[in-house]
Amino acid sequence: MKTPLTEAISAADVRGSYLSNTEMQAVFGRFNRARAGLAAAQAFSNNGKKWAEAAANHVYQKFPYTTQMSGPQYASTPEGKSKCVRDIDHYLRTISYCCVVGGTGPLDEYVVSGLSELNSALGLSPSWYVAALEFVRDNHGLNGDVAGEANIYLNYAINALS
């Protein structure tokens, strides 16, 4: 999994040398942001389920047809609603992993890769998840550097889905 730390080490190893000044700056940058990243990950751990449920309700309000149309990709049944919350929760959990490692590696490997094919095959609209993640970003209640760390990866996921 790619992270700022593994990329710096890999680049130095390929050259057969110690970390360069630029690579050391990347490593120090990660450590400087680590406290905020871990606090953001903790916020996701503490609130992720609640955020996923609130985001799903926002999606149902923004796209009312999702609760009115039948089919496995819609939220017209309790099972459909449960799947929607589960999917949003999966995004949020993966974003929390990004906050821990300080890079987009978890999203790239576990979510973004093959995402459009998966959504297409299942008849899922990326706009539902974009709306859900935007809702979480705009309503998570985090502040300062912690919000900044969370929002980096929320925005990355939103852009990947767009």
Curated annotation (Swiss-Prot):
Q: Does the keyword NAD apply?
A: no
Can you list the GO cellular component terms from the UniProt entry?
phycobilisome; plasma membrane-derived thylakoid membrane
Pfam families in the record = Phycobilisome (PF00502)
GO term, biological process aspect, one: photosynthesis
- Binding residues for (15Z)-phycoviolobilin: 84
Q: List the disulfide bonds.
A: none
UniProt-listed InterPro entries:
Globin-like_sf, Phycobilisome_asu/bsu, Phycobilisome_asu/bsu_sf
The family classification in the record reads: Belongs to the phycobiliprotein family.
Protein purpose: Light-harvesting photosynthetic bile pigment-protein from the phycobiliprotein complex.
User: This protein is called what?
Assistant: Phycoerythrocyanin alpha chain
The scientific name of the source species is Nostoc sp. (strain PCC 7120 / SAG 25.82 / UTEX 2576)
Show the taxonomic lineage.
Bacteria, Bacillati, Cyanobacteriota, Cyanophyceae, Nostocales
The gene behind this protein is pecA
